[in-house]
Amino acid sequence: FPYTTLFRSPNDPTNGGRALILLDKAGLLKLKDNKNIASTKADIVENPHNYQIVELEAAQLPRSFEDVDLATVNTNYALEAGLNPAKDALVLEDKESPYANIIAVRQGDENRPEIQKLVKALQSEEIKKFIAEKYKGAIVPAF
């Protein structure tokens, strides 16, 4: 991607850092610390192709495709725009991503029967199959 323009969201620093980490993972640039979710453009230590990184609100990214060569897009916005991340993406976070959604409860509530039942249901093979069928690889179960 010579002289590619990349977009990321300044209004959402967490996902901006995730985007840079993905670009590092893809070998397009190198960050000081490719595990630092708070990474910004200032943390790029190597940009051998002089990519221009333009920041844009995450929800606008799918609409910007005609103006750029490459964009980093959150899965929810990609799906809303009719994209198929499993086919359209060059790089995706995998099930080992530390940014997977989690089930969180207050300390002391983790052993409540209804919480245990919910966790068991949400992490079942039935739910895994539902995710696979519904999202066709765009969302990867992290359990």
Question: PLM features: residue spans?
Answer:
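Short, small-residue-biased leader/transition segments that mark boundaries at the very start
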Residues: 1-6
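A bilobed periplasmic-binding-protein/Venus flytrap-type ligand-binding module shared by bacterial periplasmic
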Residues: 7, 100-114
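Bilobed "Venus flytrap"/periplasmic-binding protein-like clamshell domains
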Residues: 7-45, 125
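Short secondary-structure boundary segments
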Residues: 11, 75-77, 107
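Periplasmic-binding protein-like
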Residues: 17-24, 122-142
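Short amphipathic alpha-helical coupling segments at ligand-binding clamshell hinges
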Residues: 18, 111-121
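Short helices/loops that flank or line small-molecule/ion binding pockets
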Residues: 20-22, 42-72, 77
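Short beta-strand->loop
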Residues: 69-70, 82-96
